[in-house]
Amino acid sequence: MSDSKEPRLQQLGLLEEEQLRGLGFRQTRGYKSLAGCLGHGVLVLQLLSFTLLAGLFVQVSKVPSSISQEQSRQDSIYQNLTQLKAAVGELSEKSKLQEIYQELTQLKAAVSELPEKSKQQEIYQELTQLKAAVSELPEKSKLQEIYQELTQLKAAVSELPEKSKLQEIYQELTRLKAAVGELPEKCKLQEIYQELTRLKAAVDELPEKSKLQEIYQELTQLKAAVGELPEKSRLQEIYQELTQLKAAVERLCHPCPWEWTFFQGNCYFISNSQRNWHDSITACQEVGAQLVVIKSAEEQNFLQLQSSRSNRFTWMGLSDLNQEGTWQWVDGSPLLPSFKQYWNRGEPNNVGEEDCAEFSGNGWNDDKCNLAKFWICKKSAASCSRDEEQFLSPAPATPNPPPA
């Protein structure tokens, strides 16, 4: 019986040894002796417990690494989301427009899918609301107001006094015609024609017998009167006076052209049309003058009076176009401090780029250079000879010349 147990024990020993080898344990000589001493059962339990503890230790040691990997994965996902958000924020305007277009397309498709009945109901509701809004308009709506204005205008036209515009024009023409008829140019020929007309009427009214006699008498008296006229009759004297006056005028010195005004050795032209400041300079240059440059207080007072009389806004040759706030005349000379008193109160104020000066009211004003206004040209007067100056000046009273 003992002999049969020993082979079985050997087989068990070999099996345990292989299992331990599989678990990574190496049998030593001491181990074999110890196993032999303590018995195989207890040893197996101890070894199994030790193996389980070792495996558990290995698994526990792997937990922190898996947690760190999960954290790393979450960090990576967060970074990717951040980059994606930044990329979306950096989308071009074109992409945004495309998205809007897509939204609109989807909305259009959704609207087109509405049932026809729903569309009709919406249209009907809109029309109903519009009709209600129109019916709630006040009586005096825009069309009604326009109609009333036209009605009132028509009534006002129909109520115009008899002296309406056409009647006034007609009266003006009538007065003008009468004034023309009274012109002195109804001169000798017209008067002679009228006299002949009256004479013819008088002759026609004469009795047949006395007509020839009276005509003869009239002719005789006329002939006698003509014969008694002095050589220098009144008409001849007037003609001679006019001839002499014409010759004297032609000999006069003209320091300024016609329609120019003479003052202190200079000639001034005040325009009757309007131009902007730059074109006013050109207009003066075309007649050999320049846009007026003021040199004295007397000249300023004279020009200001001319401008205020006509109640016009008139350009002068002063601007601060070269440098804002530095006023300069067109001849390059600066504006003297003593002339700053001529600015109107609060001027110059450069409201809206006002860089050119004008006569305005009783003083000066700055205004926009591109505006059209009247202008004043200035140039030196022509010099007259000594004889002409004596001729122009009044002659002193002298006694009658001595007899020759």
Curated annotation (Swiss-Prot):
A motif (Endocytosis signal) lies at residues 14-15, 16-18, 31-34. Sequence repeats lie at residues 96-118, 119-141, 142-164, 165-187, 188-210, 211-233, 234-257. Residues 96-257 are annotated as: 7 X approximate tandem repeats. This is CD209 antigen. Its main location: membrane. Residues 263-378 form the C-type lectin domain. Pfam families: Lectin_C (PF00059). It comes from the Eukaryota. GO terms for cellular component: membrane. InterPro entries: C-type_lectin-like, C-type_lectin-like/link_sf, C-type_lectin/snaclec_domain, C-type_lectin_CS, CD209-like_CTLD, CTDL_fold. SUPFAM superfamilies: C-type lectin-like. Pathogen-recognition receptor expressed on the surface of immature dendritic cells (DCs) and involved in initiation of primary immune response. Thought to mediate the endocytosis of pathogens which are subsequently degraded in lysosomal compartments. The receptor returns to the cell membrane surface and the pathogen-derived antigens are presented to resting T-cells via MHC class II proteins to initiate the adaptive immune response. Probably recognizes in a calcium-dependent manner high mannose N-linked oligosaccharides in a variety of pathogen antigens. On DCs it is a high affinity receptor for ICAM2 and ICAM3 by binding to mannose-like carbohydrates. May act as a DC rolling receptor that mediates transendothelial migration of DC presursors from blood to tissues by binding endothelial ICAM2. Seems to regulate DC-induced T-cell proliferation by binding to ICAM3 on T-cells in the immunological synapse formed between DC and T-cells.
